[in-house]
């Protein structure tokens, strides 16, 4: 059979296989189009579960007459025009496939009117020939789309539809998700002429609470904790259920990224980690959560139904969500204890109108300064209390590298569990403070008496339960000096007293990595499991001798499993090499071990030279960060690297030249 271009109808029907899975898929695409058009009211009419009729009417901006035909064409959209638009997408739709795909498997009528038009126009298309017919119509400003006889021309797809009740249930659940994502939009749903759902637009807090109760039930609202956390361009807010409001099934779990419905594995894992110590295995958390992130830092074009995204800083997002959830639950538990002790029970209060009564939600605001412990110890607590999981983000990735922290608070007497000579770097702890900054000083002062004792107890209890990761740091009895600027992209200009020096930043990266790996001489490096184990091909002879290197690899935190005679699976690696191209690094390492049979020290130096760094040019902030890490890792031993690491700059002749002019 020769290669040929597919007919437009067939191409659209193939695309419809991904876009139009069932009637709920049609509703999703069309309602999202209405929201993108700025609609504040959307009416949905369904007949026979959507197989007979799906009608979506909105009061959005409408579609001009000369664009109606184009709107039913494939890859036609008003939402993006270039790759830059795609990488910074803020609309729900952007592919331009929905209307063309839907019209190819149904009888579709698109009626619309804009503010600039005196009359509306209607476009009709059928699945067979895709010929679009235009005619005038009576219609207010906005758009109405009628989808009749879904899958009428694809019987194989139609027979896979479930009962009308089942299909409508999917539509109902979909609209619940949309109603929660856009509280400012009124949504009405009818089935077979009967009004089923009315979600009125909500602006005030009481209106929002009523809408939440209408979607999730009053029981969720009664046990809801309001959570809000912000870090730079990353924002996290919403409602989570307290452990008392846990459910027997995960039917109230809604998550949104930049307003887009998500069922993302990374997000779900972070939420489960946050609830891990609060819920038994047979119960499920309930939550409505919103994540707002710079569109450039997330790729939404990775899933056919856009249910998953790819974060550019996945570990940062994961840890951020975990800390917000875990902190809210801890704070909520503290408030609950006080309420139970000091306030009368709800049953004792007089409620005149039980139908409209919803108990106010507990509001959570992180307040680290209320602890008895100094700020640096509070930060250490937050880091150490985070449980281990695959690819857990390092502390430094939480904060901008340019941030610094100078704490003037003096250490106070600490419980036994706080005393540890092998503590993480003080600089890193002070940097971490940015995530724990209280949003309101007034809120902090007004509730300090309530939270001080309970927060101290819960924090101490968590530290005693989770063993902290030990980080060995050399005594810092030498300093490289102050970083003034970056010269020629890869050198840092330092000032040590009156002496100026030039630091080779690329060689400094090697020294840092060498120091991190050399800590294996004190204790084995901690393996960090890969989120997805990596299969790597190697020579059969190396695979047969893999057991000879097991002890050395284990001490370096590298966990390998034999898959077959020519393949191994990388299960975990240590932190210094986890960002590397393991597909190349691991086979090269095994070949090096096979050919040279090196000592541990030789392997450490070899690995340090192999590790590549992405920085083509360094910023001053990155140089400062690197200098501080070198000082903490090596201390006085930095002298051993001076010939290649650091060189003095003699400006005497330059100064003398000025004096002779």
UniProtKB/Swiss-Prot annotation:
<dbReference type="GO" id="GO:0016887">
    <property type="term" value="F:ATP hydrolysis activity"/>
</dbReference>
<protein>
    <recommendedName>
        <fullName>DNA mismatch repair protein MutL</fullName>
    </recommendedName>
</protein>
<feature type="compositionally biased region" description="Low complexity">
    <location>
        <begin position="400"/>
        <end position="412"/>
    </location>
</feature>
<dbReference type="Pfam" id="PF01119">
    <property type="entry name" value="DNA_mis_repair"/>
</dbReference>
<dbReference type="InterPro" id="IPR014790">
    <property type="entry name" value="MutL_C"/>
</dbReference>
<keyword id="KW-0227">DNA damage</keyword>
<dbReference type="InterPro" id="IPR020568">
    <property type="entry name" value="Ribosomal_Su5_D2-typ_SF"/>
</dbReference>
<dbReference type="GO" id="GO:0140664">
    <property type="term" value="F:ATP-dependent DNA damage sensor activity"/>
</dbReference>
<dbReference type="GO" id="GO:0005524">
    <property type="term" value="F:ATP binding"/>
</dbReference>
<feature type="region of interest" description="Disordered">
    <location>
        <begin position="367"/>
        <end position="424"/>
    </location>
</feature>
<dbReference type="InterPro" id="IPR020667">
    <property type="entry name" value="DNA_mismatch_repair_MutL"/>
</dbReference>
<dbReference type="GO" id="GO:0032300">
    <property type="term" value="C:mismatch repair complex"/>
</dbReference>
<dbReference type="GO" id="GO:0030983">
    <property type="term" value="F:mismatched DNA binding"/>
</dbReference>
<dbReference type="InterPro" id="IPR013507">
    <property type="entry name" value="DNA_mismatch_S5_2-like"/>
</dbReference>
<dbReference type="InterPro" id="IPR036890">
    <property type="entry name" value="HATPase_C_sf"/>
</dbReference>
<dbReference type="InterPro" id="IPR038973">
    <property type="entry name" value="MutL/Mlh/Pms-like"/>
</dbReference>
<keyword id="KW-0234">DNA repair</keyword>
<dbReference type="InterPro" id="IPR042120">
    <property type="entry name" value="MutL_C_dimsub"/>
</dbReference>
<dbReference type="Pfam" id="PF08676">
    <property type="entry name" value="MutL_C"/>
</dbReference>
<comment type="function">
    <text>This protein is involved in the repair of mismatches in DNA. It is required for dam-dependent methyl-directed DNA mismatch repair. May act as a 'molecular matchmaker', a protein that promotes the formation of a stable complex between two or more DNA-binding proteins in an ATP-dependent manner without itself being part of a final effector complex.</text>
</comment>
<dbReference type="Pfam" id="PF13589">
    <property type="entry name" value="HATPase_c_3"/>
</dbReference>
<comment type="similarity">
    <text>Belongs to the DNA mismatch repair MutL/HexB family.</text>
</comment>
<dbReference type="InterPro" id="IPR037198">
    <property type="entry name" value="MutL_C_sf"/>
</dbReference>
<dbReference type="InterPro" id="IPR002099">
    <property type="entry name" value="MutL/Mlh/PMS"/>
</dbReference>
<dbReference type="InterPro" id="IPR042121">
    <property type="entry name" value="MutL_C_regsub"/>
</dbReference>
<dbReference type="GO" id="GO:0006298">
    <property type="term" value="P:mismatch repair"/>
</dbReference>
<dbReference type="InterPro" id="IPR014721">
    <property type="entry name" value="Ribsml_uS5_D2-typ_fold_subgr"/>
</dbReference>
<dbReference type="InterPro" id="IPR014762">
    <property type="entry name" value="DNA_mismatch_repair_CS"/>
</dbReference>
């Amino acid at each position: 059979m020769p290669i040929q271009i597919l007919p437009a109808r067939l191409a659209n029907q193939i695309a419809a296989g991904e876009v139009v899975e069932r009637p709920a898929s049609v509703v999703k695409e069309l309602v999202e189009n209405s929201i993108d058009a700025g609609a504040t009211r959307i009416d949905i009419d369904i007949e026979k579960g959507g197989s007979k009729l799906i009608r979506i009417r909105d009061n959005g901006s409408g579609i001009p007459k000369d664009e109606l035909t184009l709107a039913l064409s494939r890859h036609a959209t008003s939402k993006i025009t270039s790759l830059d638009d795609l990488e910074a997408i803020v609309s729900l739709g952007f592919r331009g496939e929905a209307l063309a795909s839907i019209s190819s498997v149904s009888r579709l009528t698109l009626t619309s009117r804009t503010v600039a038009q005196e009359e509306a126009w209607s476009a009709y298309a059928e699945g067979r020939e895709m010929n679009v017919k235009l005619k005038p119509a009576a219609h207010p400003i906005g758009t109405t789309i009628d989808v009749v006889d879904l899958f009428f021309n694809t019987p194989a797809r139609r027979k896979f539809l479930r009962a009308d009740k089942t299909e409508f249930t999917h539509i109902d659940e979909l609209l619940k998700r949309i109603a929660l994502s856009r509280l400012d939009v009124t949504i009405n749903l009818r089935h077979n002429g009967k009004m089923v759902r009315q979600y009125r637009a909500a602006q005030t807090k009481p209106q929002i609470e009523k809408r939440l109760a209408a979607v999730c039930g009053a029981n969720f609202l009664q046990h809801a904790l309001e959570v809000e956390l912000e870090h730079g361009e990353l924002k996290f807010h919403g409602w989570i259920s307290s452990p008392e409001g846990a459910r027997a099934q995960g039917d109230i779990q809604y998550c949104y990224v930049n307003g887009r419905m998500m069922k993302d594995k990374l997000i779900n894992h972070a939420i489960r980690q946050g609830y891990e110590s609060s819920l038994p295995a047979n119960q499920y958390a309930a939550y409505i959560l919103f994540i707002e992130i710079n569109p450039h830092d997330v790729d939404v074009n990775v899933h056919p139904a856009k249910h998953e995204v790819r974060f550019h800083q996945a570990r940062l997002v994961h840890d951020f969500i975990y800390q917000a959830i875990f902190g809210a639950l801890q704070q909520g538990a503290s408030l609950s204890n006080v309420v139970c002790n000091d306030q009368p029970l709800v049953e004792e209060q007089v409620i005149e109108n039980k139908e409209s009564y919803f108990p106010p939600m507990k509001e959570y605001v992180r307040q680290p300064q209320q602890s008895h412990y100094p700020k640096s110890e509070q930060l250490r607590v937050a880091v150490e209390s985070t449980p281990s999981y695959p690819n857990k983000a390092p502390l430094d990735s939480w904060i901008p590298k340019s941030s610094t922290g100078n704490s003037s608070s003096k250490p106070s007497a600490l419980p036994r569990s706080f005393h540890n000579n092998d503590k993480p770097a003080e600089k890193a702890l002070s940097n971490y403070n940015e995530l724990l900054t209280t949003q309101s000083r007034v809120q902090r002062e007004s509730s300090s008496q309530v939270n001080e004792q309970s927060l101290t107890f819960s924090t101490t209890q968590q530290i005693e339960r989770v063993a902290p990761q030990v980080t060995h740091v050399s005594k810092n009895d030498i300093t490289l000096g102050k970083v003034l600027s970056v010269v020629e992209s890869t050198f840092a200009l330092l000032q040590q007293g009156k002496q100026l020096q030039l630091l080779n930043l690329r060689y400094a990266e090697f020294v840092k990595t060498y120091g991190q790996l050399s800590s294996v001489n004190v204790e084995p490096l901690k393996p960090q499991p890969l989120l997805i184990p990596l299969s790597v091909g190697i020579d059969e002879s190396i695979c047969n001798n893999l057991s000879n290197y097991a002890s050395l690899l284990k001490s370096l935190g590298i966990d390998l499993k034999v898959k077959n005679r020519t393949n191994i699976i990388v299960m975990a690696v240590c932190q210094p090499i986890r960002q590397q191209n393991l597909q190349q690094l691991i086979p090269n390492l095994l070949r090096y071990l096979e050919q040279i049979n090196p000592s541990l020290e030789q392997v450490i130096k070899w690995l340090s030279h192999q590790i590549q760094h992405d920085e083509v040019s360094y910023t001053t902030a990155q140089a400062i960060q690197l200098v501080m890490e070198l000082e903490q890792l090596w201390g006085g031993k930095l002298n051993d690297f001076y010939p290649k690491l650091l060189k003095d700059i003699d400006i005497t002749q330059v100064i003398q030249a000025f004096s002779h002019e």
